[in-house]
Amino acid sequence: MSQPTTLYDKIWNDHLVHEAEDGTCLIYIDRHLVHEVTSPQAFEGLRVAGRKVHAPEKTLAVVDHNVPTTDRSKPNPDPESAEQIAALAQNARDFGIEYYNEFDKRQGIVHVIGPEQGFTLPGTTIVCGDSHTSTHGAFGALAHGIGTSEVEHVLATQTLIQKKAKNMRAVVDGKLPDGVTAKDIILAIIGEIGTAGGTGYVLEYAGEAIRALSMEGRMTVCNMSIEGGARAGLIAPDETAYEFLKGRPKAPKGADWDAALRYWETLRSDDGAHFDHEIRLDAAKLPPIVTWGTSPEDVIAVTGKVPDPAAIEDEAKRLSKERALHYMGLLPGTKITDIRLDRVFIGSCTNGRIEDLRAAAKIAEGRTVNGNVSAMVVPGSGLVKEQAEAEGLDKIFTRAGFEWREPGCSMCLAMNPDKLKPDERCASTSNRNFEGRQGFKGRTHLVSPSMAAAAAIAGHFVDIREWR
């Protein structure tokens, strides 16, 4: 009888090409997603070496990081961004790669469009020159970010050199209370393990609460695996995943679908499989969460108060948290609901999908954005935007005073025109609250879409569970 195996081990073993004596492995890569920021040097390396892209049909390119989310008929105001976008278009033509430019309705954030097109499939290995590639693990794919030199290696060989990670599992049982979402689950997990807690691991999410999530919710959870230090996040595929993928443009069809389904149904951790580390959370006890500092591990219930670092015994950690409070312009003991806001951003590869926009629109409908707040909604892709407009969500947002934008990474990161000004405070549905992440001296609080929408209307954080 074979030894029980984890989901990660199964996918890894299916893609292992060679293992050296020191544990260094060569694994086959099924899918490669490419964007404009981390690919120019990789393509130039191929040119210099006289190499072709090994498997262009397994490579998909899209612009997302640098594209403006306003009127795209006008020239890009940033020459460097415009150059990177033009370079990706040229590289896609030269190397025969499918490419979604900024005028293609299929364009969007790379981690939104992959699943949307059915390019992301269970049991595959997926890489991209972007740390949030872990998003695709929601489908039971082994997906993680790579560096630019590795982008070139995958383009040239369709393989990747790395060492195998350890197995970790986060089990979330129970039922989420009303107003508590997938975003709160992953923030709670990161708060529990810290931003280094998953280092050296691939993190599988399991349990009743995870199973109850939609695919959008599962993508939110897996998206932030890297914020917990993990190389990748995984959720075993099930009927929810199959239903999402069936009929997608790049998903298998007919007999190929039936064959794929038979394989996908084997993709789960066996009973008794060994995990090197495991944590457990009770979903029923989770509150809506807000980050207060400059690390995703700096989490607090919306009903809580900004903590006092003086109670931290470890000097390095205490100094780090004191610096975070100074940067954020907050005092210990401040009620989270007393924190007033300047900006609200709803979007990103964490929370820019149709379910996220519906949740925010439900809060915004019939209400008005606070006069002291500038709020924007940025769909994760052109197809999400199209669906939202078909449902009238854009009208709900614009009537309430939100800006309705074109798809892209937008204010998640300060690499395009959507940026915070110094000392502006933002409630954001994105994934990182680092110093300067959304703009020089910008102050970021991570929250769910419904929490962000409510904060935009109130002008400060509110407990969404009490929203009327």
Swiss-Prot record:
Highest taxon in the source lineage: Bacteria
Entry EC number(s): 4.2.1.33
GO terms assigned for molecular function: 3-isopropylmalate dehydratase activity; 4 iron, 4 sulfur cluster binding; metal ion binding
Keywords carried by this UniProt record: 4Fe-4S, Amino-acid biosynthesis, Branched-chain amino acid biosynthesis, Iron, Iron-sulfur, Leucine biosynthesis, Lyase, Metal-binding
Listed pathway(s): Amino-acid biosynthesis; L-leucine biosynthesis; L-leucine from 3-methyl-2-oxobutanoate: step 2/4
Keyword set includes Iron: yes
Cofactor descriptive note: Binds 1 [4Fe-4S] cluster per subunit.
Reactions catalysed: (2R,3S)-3-isopropylmalate = (2S)-2-isopropylmalate
Residue sites binding [4Fe-4S] cluster per the record: C349, C409, C412
Presence of the UniProt keyword RNA-binding in the record: no
One Pfam family linked to the record: Aconitase
SUPFAM superfamilies: Aconitase iron-sulfur domain (SSF53732)
HAMAP family (UniProt xref): LeuC_type1 (MF_01026)
Family from the record: Belongs to the aconitase/IPM isomerase family. LeuC type 1 subfamily.
Reported function: Catalyzes the isomerization between 2-isopropylmalate and 3-isopropylmalate, via the formation of 2-isopropylmaleate.
Oligomer and partners: Heterodimer of LeuC and LeuD.
Name of this chain's protein: 3-isopropylmalate dehydratase large subunit
Species of origin: Nitrobacter winogradskyi (strain ATCC 25391 / DSM 10237 / CIP 104748 / NCIMB 11846 / Nb-255)
Upper lineage: Bacteria, Pseudomonadati, Pseudomonadota, Alphaproteobacteria, Hyphomicrobiales
